[in-house]
A protein has these predicted regions:
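P-loop NTPase nucleotide-binding/switch module
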Residues: 171-206, 210, 240-290
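The Walker A (P-loop) glycine that initiates the GxxxxGKT/S ATP-binding motif of P-loop NTPases
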Residues: 218, 280, 302
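Walker B catalytic acidic pair
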Residues: 295, 301-302, 313
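Peripheral, non-AAA+ core regions of ATP-driven protein-machinery
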Residues: 1-215, 219-225, 326, 462, ...
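Residues immediately C-terminal
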Residues: 112, 298-299, 305-306, 392
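Walker A/P-loop
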Residues: 215-258, 320
Length: 497
């Protein structure tokens, strides 16, 4: 048979669209033509594949070869198609049965010796292959990652000759079984390790219970970073769908091995990070920090030290839960449903309001420092809290109920109420959901309107205040939002926006 078809997968963002590798052998002078919009790395595949076939002791067809990677309008890059191209050549030249390649997808880069090297982005391809009911052939180094897609039949290989023997029936390969090495979770740091800061811990609990964004402001050394790092431990465990989304993003970003499966991510980029590092980008779009924090926590320490233009790009994903990166030929959509936790000092030196009087910043310096944060960005942060310095002990005794397990139990109860009532966390309520689930009595509504006018709160800030009040009521396991919930939620708003 002079025509063979092999199935493979490309990588576009966190998606893995299907690619059909068609190999045709014709009479004529020996040559190889590769079509289907291949990038440079794919065009180089023909040399790698030829050397791999010859060095494996197999016959490279001395005929006119045409390779088509369909669909032609899908950009293709990397060495992930090497294995599919090699199998297509061998099947078209009769060295292995072409019918054996039906319902089988192949991924892998070939070394010149015929060894099969690992690639990135295997998990999205594994999930897509599982949805199609296909078997997936991957490099042995990627097999454990592919097995995260439970129910998928995975064939793990180290060398091209193993596959030839497998398809010819001489040495069938047993489907790979996961060893479970990637299912080990690291313990979260405990909330009881944070001394004092009762108000800040309360705000952290509220943020976890409703998936609210949070901003800590205070002098250095008051525990802002310590508090933020405890938030992932308070959040409910990821379900299988969420865990696979997180793992797929890490796979695409080469964050392997996936030793954190199935934990929520905690990302802490440096304040010198560029816009592309934060939201993603590049000539070949790659996920940024906001995507790597999907279903987890994005912690921005020293918030005003970030470039203002970088911070402003957070506004859209904070509302929509995704980011779209457009290039000349590509338009890639990355998920970005993260929980923002930020920390900042009250002034450039950090000691404004300290009893010691150490602050020497002028009014102009303080105003210029705070003006780095725009009103629309601050509007999108639900909880604003000043973390004051407290007296500390060298060996503090943890308080009863002041630990991660106790707080996480309260969060789980509140989240369960929200899922039963509206199917999402309170922070993600849309306007119709807000009207339906955050209704107030006439007296409380008038009281809230007066408070919003005095504090000059925007309509968006008022809506976020209502969502926080809804979360406070859920923590108390009550259905109606009361005046006490509104009053506490109001305390978490800055005095001006």
């Amino acid at each position: 048979m002079s025509l063979a078809i092999v199935l493979s997968r490309a990588q576009v963002g966190v998606e893995a669209p299907a690619v059909t590798v068609e190999c045709h052998l014709a009479n004529g002078l020996p040559a190889l033509t590769l079509v289907g919009l291949p990038e440079g790395a794919v065009r180089e595949s023909k040399d790698r594949v030829r050397s791999a076939i010859l060095n494996s002791g197999l016959e490279y067809p001395a005929r006119r070869i045409t390779l088509n990677l369909a669909p032609a309008d899908l950009p293709k890059d990397g060495g992930r198609f090497d294995l599919a191209i090699a199998l297509g050549l061998l099947a078209a030249s009769g060295q292995l049965p072409a019918h054996a390649l039906q319902d089988v997808e192949c991924l892998g880069e070939l070394a010149l010796s015929g060894a099969i090297r690992p690639i990135q982005g295997v998990l999205p391809a594994a999930l897509a292959a599982r949805a199609e009911g296909h078997t997936l052939i991957v490099p042995a180094a990627n097999a454990e990652e592919a097995c995260l897609a439970s129910g998928l039949r995975v064939i793990a290989v180290n060398h091209l000759l193993e596959l030839v023997a497998h398809f010819n029936g001489r040495a069938p390969i047993v489907p790979y079984e996961s060893s479970g090495l990637l299912h080990l979770s690291k313990p979260y740091p405990d909330l009881s390790e944070v001394q004092g800061q009762t108000a800040a811990k309360r705000a952290l609990l509220v943020a976890a219970a409703g998936a609210h964004n949070l901003l800590f402001s205070g002098p250095p050394g008051t525990g802002k970073t310590l508090l933020a790092s405890r938030l992932p431990g308070l959040l409910p465990p990821l379900d299988e769908h969420e865990a696979l989304e997180v793992a797929a993003i890490q796979s695409v970003a080469s964050q392997s091995p996936l030793t954190s499966w199935p934990q929520r991510p905690f990302r802490q980029p440096h304040h010198s990070a560029s816009g592309a590092a934060l939201v993603g980008g590049g000539s070949r779009p790659q996920p940024g920090e906001i995507t790597l924090a999907h279903h987890g926590v994005l912690f921005l320490d020293e918030l005003p030290e970030f470039d203002r233009k970088v911070l402003e790009v957070l506004r859209e994903p904070l509302e929509s839960g995704h980011i779209v990166i457009a290039r000349a030929r590509d338009r890639v959509r990355f998920p970005a449903r993260f929980q923002l936790v930020a920390a900042m000092n009250p002034c450039p030196c950090g000691y404004l309001g300290e009893p010691s009087g150490r602050c020497r910043c002028s009014t102009e310096q303080i105003q210029r420092y705070r003006n780095k944060l725009s009103g629309p960005l601050l509007d999108r942060i639900d909880l604003h809290l000043t973390v004051a310095r407290e007296a500390t002990a060298l060996n503090p005794t943890p308080q009863t109920g002041d630990d991660t397990a106790s707080a996480a139990a309260l969060v789980a109860q509140a989240r369960e109420r929200q899922q039963r009532r509206q199917g999402c966390a309170n922070a993600f309520l849309d306007l119709p959901g807000l009207r339906k689930h955050c209704s107030l009595s006439s007296a409380d509504e008038n009281w809230l309107e007066t408070a919003c006018e005095r504090l000059t709160l925007s309509l968006r800030a008022a809506h976020r205040l209502l969502k926080v009040a809804r979360t406070l009521a859920d923590l108390e396991q009550v259905d109606a939002i009361g005046r006490s919930h509104l009053a506490e939620a109001l305390q978490y708003r800055p005095s001006s926006n």
